[in-house]
Amino acid sequence: MKIAYVFKSNMASTFQLGTMILPQLEDNSHLVNVVGMFFFDDNIMCLQKGNPVGERLAKIAKEKKMHLMVCDQCAVRRELAEGTFEQCGSGEVKAKGLVDGVVAGCFPQLYSALGPNAPDPVSYTHLTLPTICSV
């Protein structure tokens, strides 16, 4: 099964990603093909250059061809992107200060990026945080 994660809830990247999902990806026990991850709000902070979780994730993402994206508005607010709020959603905002392979964007850019490798549909009645999305 192919899935994409959306990290939206408070500390999802610290707790669910850092202590559960990432270790499973590293030891190949996650049992699904994660094709992408999308980060909102303070969850993007784990992707700053030098952050141990972000550096580990960047390595896995490169190996597994996983798409990593941060919300462009969230990144602009935290000075982790070059661009303006008016450019958000257009694909013009560029991530900065983040681990290798991370891009900034909004849902239109996420859908375009994952389109060729789209996740499988998932039942939204069984969601846990971080959200498993079918995009």
Residue ranges and their predicted role:
Residues 19-21, 51-56:
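Charged helix-capping and loop-helix junction motifs
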Residues 57-99:
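Mid-chain, well-packed structural core segment of small domains
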Residues 97, 105-113, 117:
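A short aromatic-anchored loop/beta-hairpin motif
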Residues 125-131:
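Conserved small/polar residues in nucleotide/adenosyl-binding loops
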